């Protein structure tokens, strides 16, 4: 059986609120760490989210 190309990652807020999103990414085409600008409902504004491992 082949190895899966998509892996689950956690996008953690840089506003230090502890809020995170869980998403998937293709590990073969996107080898660097993912960053996205998304909405943080605890901070009530759009902030940068950085990729961390799911524990």
From Swiss-Prot:
* Alphabetically ordered keywords of this record: Ribonucleoprotein, Ribosomal protein
| Superkingdom of the organism of origin | Bacteria
Gene3D superfamilies per record: Ribosomal protein L33 (2.20.28.120)
CC terms in the record's Gene Ontology section? cytosolic large ribosomal subunit
One MF term in the entry's GO annotations? structural constituent of ribosome
Share an example GO biological-process annotation for this protein.
translation
Instruction: Report any Pfam family annotated for this entry.
Output: Ribosomal_L33
- InterPro entries per the record? Ribosomal_bL33 (IPR001705), Ribosomal_bL33_CS (IPR018264), Ribosomal_bL33_sf (IPR038584), Ribosomal_zn-bd (IPR011332)
Check the record and name the NCBIfam families matching this protein: PRK00595.1, rpmG_bact
Q: Which family does it belong to?
A: Belongs to the bacterial ribosomal protein bL33 family.
Annotated protein name in UniProt: Large ribosomal subunit protein bL33
Organism this protein belongs to = Chelativorans sp. (strain BNC1)
């Amino acid at each position: 059986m082949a190895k899966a190309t998509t892996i689950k990652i956690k996008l953690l807020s840089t506003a230090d609120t502890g809020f995170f999103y869980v998403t998937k990414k293709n590990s073969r085409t996107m080898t660097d760490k993912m960053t996205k600008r998304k909405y943080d409902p605890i901070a009530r504004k759009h902030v940068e989210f950085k990729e961390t491992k799911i524990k």
